[in-house]
């Protein structure tokens, strides 16, 4: 890389931009449009290599090959982002500025050496992403959500809202969903906790998965949904389709943002209401964020038990408060006490998950909602993770603990055929 290091970044980017323009002038774009993906890429790569090898620049053969690949990515892909999108260990791509590209790998953020040429180059890639899904981003509409072909979730925000230039965030999703076995291997939870959670799902308890940004709520929801019997009819509702359920009888619904004229939006609440007319056995909502919380509670309370959803909150009690606030967004003027009664009646358990400072994810608590206590929602922890220390390498140490509490819903599960081992609830700790 010595040649590339001595060859100033600005010069390298300029040569790449100049070659990009020259190559586009040489290509028969109409002919390429009729070619298949692989044959078109191969044909363009030959043109690119000829153009690169014709340039008098201090680059080795390997560096010229890299330059050729980067120009190919500019023409067919998403420029500097392409190598990151091909790296399955990358879970998030965060572009703060054109020359500040971060990734999350194994729960840790790291700065890459990748860069766009300038803000205009970054803006060009953002426009390419959103145009592929029929969206637009400009000064009149400076925020946009989109999805890549592989299911990755994209958010872009541009000036004047983004002061330092366009920003791009991409949440990646693996081709194969994380399994329960992998969560055990990663020590996200214990065998005993998983045994309880699987019984709760099979026993048709309504479960709320709570956690902060990047905590792994959707991953856990996907694992829990895997325990829904194959005979059940499932309707999933999401802002951006992320769940990867394997059951046969499943209907996937997704919200729709407004079009260029600001019309045609379909919100989660509309989909939840519509799903009730689709004879679902289970309703799985990717994340409740607003007024749809009321309709979700109604569904849980009126024959659609065994439903699952997630909420953005930092503790089980915060999750209850968040749901209460979201119900108020429906503007139905229901008294607070009545709302709490409805929540306590609808939600059987809250599973709190968190991403710790070392990047690992842990199920922090499995809590039962036991009813009302003097006007407040009463809860009790069944399992918890207790942090004990952070070692010299920054690794969080702790133990999973069974609190010794036998949940009230154990009898309900037994009646439904899911009899839990008494030893499951004996007070004990597991590393």
Predicted feature residues:
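P-loop NTP-binding catalytic core
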Residues: 87, 95, 100-203, 421
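Walker A (P-loop) phosphate-binding loop of P-loop NTPases
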Residues: 214
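Active-site phosphate-binding and catalytic loops of NTP-dependent enzymes
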Residues: 31-34, 54-61, 76-87, 129-146, ...
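Conserved phosphate/pyrophosphate-binding and hydrolysis machinery centered on Walker-type P-loop NTPases
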Residues: 9-13, 33-42, 57-68, 83-91, ...
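N-terminal anchoring/assembly modules that precede and organize ATP-driven motor systems
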Residues: 1-110
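Switch/coupling sub-region of P-loop NTPases
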Residues: 194, 198-210, 223-346, 352-354
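Conserved lysine of the Walker
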Residues: 217
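NTP-binding/hydrolysis catalytic cores, primarily Walker-type P-loop NTPases
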Residues: 359-431
